[in-house]
Amino acid sequence: MSKEKFERSKPHVNVGTIGHVDHGKTTLTAAITTVLAKVYGGAAKDFAAIDNAPEEKERGITISTSHVEYDTPTRHYAHVDCPGHADYVKNMITGAAQMDGAILVVAATDGPMPQTREHILLSRQVGVPFIVVFMNKCDMVDDEELLELVEMEVRELLSEYDFPGDDLPVIQGSALKALEGDEEWSKKIVELADALDNYIPEPERDIDKPFIMPIEDVFSISGRGTVVTGRVERGIVRTGDECEIVGMKDTTKTTVTGVEMFRKLLDEGRAGENIGALLRGTKRDDVERGQVLAKPGTITPHTKFEAEVYVLSKDEGGRHTPFFKGYRPQFYFRTTDVTGAVELPEGVEMVMPGDNLKFVVDLIAPIAMDEGLRFAIREGGRTVGAGVVSKIMD
């Protein structure tokens, strides 16, 4: 184990492999850890260890995912790889594995296939910001022109879904040959790592983003005023900051006159911390669970949006029967349920358990939201689906 591993001073970037079944995602994942461990230090993981992905639960949904990590001289990467197509769908929609960028694996022997397209579309819908392409199995294609043709096809497909197909990096390689230790093909893995370093920008840390805290509880403290508690989702709030209370009803302004944690007064509350914020001039009844406390002007309330959704299968504890247009479940955002009506897309009559689709939701009360916000779909407190806001409409 190299000492490098525990250096947390390097920026941390989350990536993952996506692409069609059997195009070599897991082999590539193994090759990256193996080659980079040799070149830069770190731990190699073999194919079997990655392929045997443990099951995890995210919002009540079982997802099989493998997590590996590796280092380049300038960064530390956390990388996810999923065994099955359904796991990718669930992973990307629940946000279980938030990706700062994805490695799209396309076999040069096949070119783009149906799941290639599906994963690119999903990436677009759930807000994966950057894609780097690894054309795999290039050792099996002798014809230079054929390789060029496949690369062109992949670039066109990415452009179709509003990724910069002409400009993004495409590396031609062979994961298996690199994994077997072939020197020339191993260089392609290092080239891929360089592409990740140079093409995927360093993600903005949660703490540097504008302040937002979902409100979980509201108390009234006599002589001091109203306190709201919750876990700071992003940013920093300081004593004296003006904030907005957004969602459920009209947005109101307030000032934070104190921040406390474990009954101690602090100057500030930061992303990831559970805090209580004392609000000046805000009455106990003006605030409720489900609203957010946020930096003014950074988030707005909405009722109508388009969502990319995964509906739980019966085996996952979901519905046993399909639902139809006019379906009105609860949508659980951050800390609360809001009823909403589902508008199915043209030509879709019913939705079966286990389906993945996009539809429009109209909520009965506004929720503070941005595109990319995750939610659960519930019926009487039981999770029956998961979704992500792909487009705000109203």
From Swiss-Prot:
Mg(2+) binds at residue 26. Residues 10-204 form the tr-type G domain. Belongs to the TRAFAC class translation factor GTPase superfamily. Classic translation factor GTPase family. EF-Tu/EF-1A subfamily. Residues 174-176 are annotated as: G5. Residues 136-139 are annotated as: G4. The keyword Magnesium applies. GO terms for molecular function: GTP binding; GTPase activity; guanosine tetraphosphate binding; translation elongation factor activity. Its EC number is 3.6.5.3. Residues 81-84 are annotated as: G3. One of its GO terms (cellular component) is cytosol. It comes from the Bacteria. Keywords: Cytoplasm, Elongation factor, GTP-binding, Hydrolase, Magnesium, Metal-binding, Nucleotide-binding, Protein biosynthesis. SUPFAM superfamilies: EF-Tu/eEF-1alpha/eIF2-gamma C-terminal domain, P-loop containing nucleoside triphosphate hydrolases, Translation proteins. It comes from Idiomarina loihiensis (strain ATCC BAA-735 / DSM 15497 / L2-TR). Monomer. Residues 60-64 are annotated as: G2. This is Elongation factor Tu. GTP hydrolase that promotes the GTP-dependent binding of aminoacyl-tRNA to the A-site of ribosomes during protein biosynthesis. It is found in: Cytoplasm. It catalyses: GTP + H2O = GDP + phosphate + H(+).
